[in-house]
Every structure is written in structure tokens, then in C-alpha cells.
């Protein structure tokens, strides 16, 4: 990281100046050197993270205005901050990959998602789903494992993982995933879905709201169609 190298350089310079012009006392020199390193490092980190934060906000506004291509370009320009701060490049790659995934441009999304930040459970889950769609089950399981390990208190990551396991015919393993999620989060939606799987039924993800649909595992229109059909059936029963 450039900010760390610059901080070390400033620290070393302050040590040399202290020994040359102020005091030969090694302990005082080391204390001043440590303070200089910390101050420079914190200052540079704040400057870089502020620039990255501003970049993310601009990209988010562009996404909300349906200017996804512009958002991607702005984020790609932000990759120049990668050498300055740890995980910045990975976070930006996660955002770019997520945008491509939301556009259903999965071919473009995967390379960025693979270079993304593992603690971003949304982008990591999108990568796992991409592997599932390519029938790369072992890579899907491995990637979901990373998403869960970095976000143990996030209920939805367990739900998405379990949904995918059930989709590939591993219902028992899906139930195990939900059990782990319930133990970590005590989320009622996970409990409800585990009960459904144990009863031989499909999971219901509408409890997670619109966020669920970004994974493109279920079409919102299909859900509405099912709900309409169910309501129509109930009306017929009432009429009889």
C-alpha cells in the first residue's frame, strides 16, 4: 500500500531528523517516529477513503438514474486508488461486478466478482449463483462458504445459499444451511423456510423484499402470477 510506504518514509525521516538535530535518546526518537507514522497513515487513509466514498455515491446515483454504463466507467476510474489502500480495489471490483450482474450481463460480471471483496456478501453470493448456473457445484459451495464466514449475522446469505442448494437437488444440505443460519441469527424467515423444506415444499423468499430479486433466481412477475392464481382459487371456493 502506498499510504503505508509513505508513512514509513515519513517516520524514518523524522527519526533521522530527531537523532541529528534534537536528541540522541533512542526511546524518545522511537516514540516520535511512531506518532508520525500513525498521523500520516491516518491522514492518507481518510483522504483516499473519502475519495472512494464520493465515487461510490456518484455511481449509486447513476444507477438509480438508470445510467449503469456511466456508473461502471466511474468505478473503473476509481481502480487507480487500489494501490493506496488495502481492499479498495476488491470493493470496487465487487461493485462493478454487481452492476453487470444486475444488468444480466453475467459473462462480464463474473471476472469482476471473482476479484471482489469476500466480505461483500451480495457480490460473493452473485458469484456463487453464477457458478451454480454453470453447473460448477463445488465452486458454488466454496464461494457461498466464504460469503457466510464473512457475514455470519446476515440472514439472507443463508437463505440464498439454501435456496440454491435446494435448486440443485440438495434439500437436506439446504436444511442444514438454514439450521446454521437460525443458530447464528434467530431469524424467523429462516425458520419458516426450514419448516417448508422439511414439509417437502419450496422456499418462500418474498419475506426478504425487493432485495431478493436482484439475484435473478426468481422473477417478480412469476411471483405475482402465482399470488394472483392463488387469490382466484380462493374466490372460486367462496363463490361455491
Model feature map: region roles:
Residues 50, 66-67, 97-108, 134-143, ...:
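Alpha-helical linker/edge segments of TPR/alpha-solenoid repeat scaffolds
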Residues 61-62, 99, 129-131, 163-164, ...:
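Residue-level signature for tetratricopeptide repeat
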Residues 24-107, 112-114:
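N-terminal topogenic membrane-targeting module
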Residues 1-51, 221-240:
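Helical anchoring/docking segments at protein termini
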Residues 10, 181-240:
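Terminal, low-structured helical/coil segments at or just beyond the last alpha-helical repeat
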Residues 82-156:
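Alpha-helical adaptor scaffolds
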Residues 42-46, 77-85, 113-120, 145-153, ...:
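Solenoid-like repeat scaffolds
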Amino acid at each position: 500500500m502506498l499510504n503505508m510506504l509513505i508513512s514509513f518514509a515519513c517516520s524514518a525521516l523524522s527519526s533521522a531528523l530527531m537523532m541529528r538535530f534534537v536528541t540522541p535518546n533512542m526511546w524518545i526518537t522511537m516514540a516520535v517516529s511512531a506518532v508520525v507514522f500513525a498521523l500520516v497513515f491516518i491522514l492518507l487513509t481518510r483522504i483516499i477513503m473519502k475519495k472512494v466514498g464520493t465515487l461510490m455515491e456518484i455511481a449509486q446515483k447513476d444507477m438509480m438514474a438508470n445510467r449503469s454504463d456511466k456508473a461502471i466507467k466511474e468505478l473503473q476510474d476509481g481502480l487507480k486508488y487500489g494501490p493506496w489502500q488495502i481492499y479498495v480495489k476488491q470493493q470496487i471490483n465487487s461493485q462493478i461486478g454487481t452492476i453487470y450482474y444486475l444488468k444480466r450481463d453475467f459473462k462480464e460480471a463474473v471476472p469482476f466478482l471473482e476479484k471482489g471483496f469476500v466480505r461483500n456478501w451480495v457480490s460473493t453470493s452473485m458469484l456463487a449463483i453464477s457458478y451454480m448456473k454453470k453447473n460448477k457445484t463445488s465452486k458454488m459451495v466454496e464461494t457461498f462458504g466464504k460469503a457466510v464466514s464473512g457475514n455470519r449475522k446476515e440472514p439472507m446469505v443463508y437463505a440464498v445459499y439454501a435456496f440454491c442448494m435446494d435448486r440443485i437437488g440438495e434439500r437436506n444440505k439446504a436444511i442444514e444451511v438454514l439450521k446454521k443460519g437460525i443458530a447464528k441469527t434467530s431469524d424467523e424467515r429462516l425458520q419458516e423456510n426450514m419448516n417448508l423444506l422439511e414439509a417437502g415444499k419450496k422456499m418462500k423468499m418474498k419475506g426478504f423484499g425487493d432485495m431478493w430479486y436482484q439475484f435473478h433466481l426468481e422473477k417478480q412477475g412469476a411471483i405475482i402470477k402465482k399470488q394472483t392464481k392463488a387469490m382466484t382459487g380462493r374466490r372460486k371456493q367462496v363463490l361455491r
